[in-house]
Swiss-Prot record:
Lineage: Eukaryota, Metazoa, Chordata, Craniata, Vertebrata
UniProt protein name: Angiopoietin-related protein 3
Underlying gene: Angptl3
One Pfam family hit: Fibrinogen_C
Gene induction: Down-regulated by insulin and leptin. Not regulated by nutritional status (fed/fasting) Up-regulated in podocytes by puromycin. Up-regulated after feeding in the hypothalamus.
Sufficient to inhibit LPL lipase activity, as annotated region: 17-165
Chain positions covered by the region annotation Required for inhibition of LPL lipase activity: 32-56
Length: 455
């Protein structure tokens, strides 16, 4: 800038020095040599000014060039950012399209599942009706078979007996196939339901809004009948001094495990097995250990009790109810699997009367294995010949009397005693097992169910 000002100052001087000689001659003739020297000095000054101006312009150009380069770099960065933003926007649009397609697919699958569920329920109802009809036919055929065997002409009618047996087996196989089909359809429905829930969960995360084995075993056989557990009731005059449960027996100084007679309040006296191995008294209500006792019993026997107190037994629902009406009790389950690992779980519980099908309501309080009994749910007891209204055919399919949930297959400590790897898969499902929700199934080798008052 200073150079430019100097240049503007020098230029007029140079111009003034170049005045026409004819005009300057009017002043004085002898001054001509002095004017020439003045013009040379002015030219030098002008040249110097121009040189400085050139350097100044050069510096200005360099600075301007640097600023322009900075501007271009910023423009390039902006262009790259805009390009990246455009790519990301396109990706988001593609993801949105994909999610919308997924949502449409989900809606279609949901409709398919609903239709399948309706169809499955219809098939299940028809299968159950058909099964009931087949059971009536089988019972009628069994009666005919019994009459044929007992009749004097039974030996002569052997071909007819063989034919009846063959027909019964065919009907049994038909029931097995039908129930297996229902089981497979239930599994498919459960898998699709889980897939739908997973997709819905993903959709909720993106902000765009739009099962245990439920298997039914195949075979329903009539169980052999075992005599009810003997009460060994004592005379009324002797019952007043009897303890109310095994805790009362223990408090009287009897610290050895064994069979004792107790008399709960408002009940007759009966024998129980008191277990003191853990250092505290427990009243056993069920024991499984070797399969010597068949537990696929009738409702009447499950109410009265069956088996041997020094072996495998079920104490009886009536006696269990009489015990637990006296106080608040803890239900303890001790389980041993086929790897000889020992587990236990304890529940606080409430047991209903005969009128409620001995409804069980539990809440887990302790244990080293997850509980498989549904908590805070009414579980009604049922057997193959006594089923609460609305329940599935769990006892017929899985064997034994138990507190069943809305679905079968979660747990059953009164099932058929099966050794591992000796039976087919349907038979294993009818065995003794414990399956916490969404976890592995424990095949049980031995089990104990026992009671102890909380106070």
């Amino acid at each position: 800038m200073h150079t430019i000002k100097l240049f503007l100052f020098v230029v007029p001087l140079v111009i003034a020095s170049r005045v026409d000689p004819d005009l300057s001659s009017f002043d004085s003739a002898p001054s001509e040599p002095k004017s020439r020297f003045a013009m040379l000095d002015d030219v030098k000054i002008l040249a110097n000014g121009l040189l400085q101006l050139g350097h100044g312009l050069k510096d200005f150009v360099h600075k301007t060039k640097g600023q322009i380069n900075d501007i271009f770099q910023k423009l390039n960065i902006f262009d790259q950012s805009f390009y990246d933003l455009s790519l990301r926007t396109n990706e988001i649009k593609e993801e949105e399209k994909e999610l919308r397609r997924t949502t449409s697919t989900l809606q279609v699958k949901n409709e398919e599942v609903k239709n399948m569920s309706v169809e499955l329920n219809s098939k299940l109802e028809s299968l159950l009706e058909e099964k009931t009809a087949l059971q009536h036919k089988v019972r009628a055929l069994e009666e005919q078979l019994t009459n044929l065997i007992l009749s004097p002409a039974g030996a002569q009618e052997h071909p007819e007996v063989t034919s009846l047996k063959s027909f019964v087996e065919q009907q049994d196989n038909s029931i097995r196939e039908l129930l297996q089909s229902v089981e497979e359809q239930y599994k498919q429905l459960s898998q699709q339901h889980m897939q739908i829930k997973e997709i819905e969960k993903q959709l909720r995360k993106t902000g765009i809004q739009e099962p245990s084995e439920n298997s039914l075993s195949s075979k329903s056989r009539a169980p052999r009948t075992t005599p009810p557990l003997q009460l060994n009731e004592t005379e009324n005059t002797e019952q007043d001094d009897l303890p109310a449960d095994c805790s009362a027996v223990y408090n009287r100084g009897e610290h050895t495990s064994g069979v004792y007679t107790i008399k709960p309040r408002n009940s007759q006296g009966f024998n129980v097995y008191c277990d003191t191995q853990s250092g505290s008294p427990w009243t056993l209500i069920q024991h499984r250990k070797d399969g010597s006792q068949d537990f696929n019993e009738t409702w009447e026997n499950y109410e009265k009790g069956f088996g041997r107190l020094d072996g495998e037994f079920w104490l009886g629902l009536e006696k269990i109810y009489a015990i637990v009406q006296q106080s608040n009790y803890i239900l303890r389950l001790e389980l041993q699997d086929w790897k000889d690992s020992k587990h236990y779980v304890e529940y606080s519980f409430h047991l209903g009367s005969h009128e409620t099908n001995y409804t069980l309501h539990v809440a887990e309080i302790a244990g080293n294995i997850p509980g498989a009994l549904p908590e805070h749910t009414d579980l009604m007891f049922s057997t193959w010949n006594h089923r609460a209204k609305g329940q599935l055919y769990c006892p017929e399919s899985y064997s034994g009397g138990w507190w069943w949930n809305d679905i079968c297959g979660e747990n059953n400590l009164n099932g058929k005693y099966n050794k591992p790897r000796t039976k087919s898969r349907p038979e294993r499902r009818r065995g003794i097992y414990w399956r916490p929700q969404s976890r592995k199934l424990y095949a049980i080798k031995s089990s104990k169910m026992m009671l102890q008052p909380t106070t």
